[in-house]
A protein has these predicted regions:
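Short, charged surface segments at domain edges that flank catalytic/cofactor-binding sites
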Residues: 1-23, 105-106
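Conserved aromatic-histidine-acidic binding/catalytic patches
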Residues: 5, 9, 54, 72
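Histidine-centered nuclease catalytic patch
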Residues: 25-62
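Short Cys/His-centered divalent metal-binding micro-motifs
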Residues: 29-33, 62-86
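Glycine-centered helix-coil hinge/cap
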Residues: 85-93
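Short flanking/linker segments adjacent to small metal-binding domains or redox-active Cys/His motifs
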Residues: 93-128
Length: 128
């Protein structure tokens, strides 16, 4: 399977997710931040992978996991699904899976603009 290219919008969205959560949602370890307030640890983990454009930037589809928990769920996808059901509920998981299988045309510039704006809002909120 070809490697998914990481776009500017992915990087912005990843930062937004890790700031939003502030910790690994499985084990609770805290995200570390640099002097600019940007996250420098943990992963923004996609339940339905980045290759699924329709849910690639869906905040419900992505959560913060530390490297250990992310690796564990990558190796144990059935347990990842069960954990997501516990976290979000069966209805939300079913919605994410459904939408992940629908077609969506990409607009990289629009996604990057949106997530840059959302990231700035979230960073400003953290400073207060």
């Amino acid at each position: 399977m070809p490697k998914i290219r990481i776009r500017t919008s992915d990087k912005l969205f990843s930062q937004w997710i890790r700031i939003r959560d502030g910790r690994c949602l499985r084990c609770g370890s805290s995200v570390k931040f640099n002097n600019s307030g940007l996250p420098i640890s943990h992963n923004a983990s996609h339940f339905q992978g980045r290759g699924k454009e329709n849910t690639r930037f869906n905040p419900d589809n992505v959560c913060t996991l530390c490297y250990g928990c992310h690796s564990y769920f990558t190796a144990h996808p059935a347990e990842h699904t069960l954990w997501q059901v516990e976290r979000l509920g069966q209805k939300k998981v079913d919605e994410i899976v459904f939408w992940s299988n629908q077609y969506k045309k990409r607009d990289d510039k629009l996604e990057a603009m949106l997530w840059k704006q959302e990231l700035t809002k979230l960073q400003d909120k953290r400073k207060v």
